């Protein structure tokens, strides 16, 4: 990161790991902490910053991207604030947030074939949840995480739940399995509960223009 003209009396900041959380910390140390960019050291074992947002490659060697993050307008306020601090590489007068908004206005998600069965589009709007499933859902999101401890998702729902359209749409969106952590499931539900009515069309989903290394990590690195 380039030298910031604003400085304070802190000599140096060390950040362990080069993932998005560390890079965001560096941005705010420069912006709000008034620490010079040259006085921030990021300690990263890998030769590439970005953590799981480390997509890359070439036409000769192939490309690797460890998944993408689905954003939602109703949440991710802290991430969007970060976007608003970062100039767009192609057009520095605009920010990552400007480009994010522009792209999602141009390319709107509206899935027409959310589920397929026997080579035909299957009905997906009815999530198929019973009252018992709803009660289990309320319990799992209401309990403190230490109550869930090391339990699995399947410890909290009946076998019926895992045959519903809701589960098919949920697990294919967020790569969940019944044996995955109930705590992680709870966190995702709390983050994306506003998407429940839109699960069949994904109309609430928002994405970056390119893979998230090029759209998020590189612009931060190039500050």
Roles of regions detected by a PLM:
Residues 8-41:
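N-terminal Rossmann-like FAD-binding beta1-loop-alpha1 element of flavoenzymes
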Residues 61-100:
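Conserved FAD-binding subdomain of flavin-dependent enzymes
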Residues 24, 28, 78-81, 215, ...:
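Short amphipathic alpha-helical face segments that pack within enzyme cores
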Residues 89-194, 204-207, 215:
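Rossmann-like flavin
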Residues 30-58:
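Glycine-rich FAD pyrophosphate-binding loop
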Residues 12-16, 40-47, 98-103:
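Extended hydrophobic secondary-structure segments that form protein cores and membrane-embedded regions
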Residues 10-11, 64-66, 198-208:
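Glycine- and acidic
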Residues 70-76, 202-222:
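Short beta-strand to alpha-helix junction loop
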């Amino acid at each position: 990161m380039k030298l910031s003209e604003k400085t304070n009396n802190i000599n140096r900041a060390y950040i362990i790991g080069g993932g998005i959380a560390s890079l965001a910390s560096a941005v705010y140390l420069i912006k709000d902490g008034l620490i010079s960019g040259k006085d921030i050291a990021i300690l990263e074992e890998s030769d590439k910053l970005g953590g799981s947002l480390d997509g890359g490659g070439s036409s000769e060697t192939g490309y690797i991207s460890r998944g993408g993050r689905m954003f939602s307008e109703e949440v991710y306020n802290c991430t969007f604030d970060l976007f608003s601090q970062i100039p767009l590489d192609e057009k520095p007068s605009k920010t990552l947030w400007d480009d994010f908004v522009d792209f999602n206005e141009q390319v709107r998600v509206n899935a027409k074939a959310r589920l397929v069965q026997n080579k035909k589009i299957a009905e997906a709007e009815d999530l198929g949840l019973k009252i018992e499933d709803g009660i289990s859902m309320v319990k799992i999101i209401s309990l403190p995480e230490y109550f869930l401890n090391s339990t699995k998702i399947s410890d909290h729902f009946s076998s019926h739940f895992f045959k519903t359209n809701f589960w098919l749409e949920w697990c294919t969106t967020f790569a969940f399995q019944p044996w995955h952590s109930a705590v992680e499931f709870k966190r995702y539900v709390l983050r994306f509960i506003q998407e429940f009515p839109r699960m069949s069309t994904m109309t609430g989903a928002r994405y970056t223009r390119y893979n998230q290394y090029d759209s998020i990590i590189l612009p931060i690195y190039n500050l």
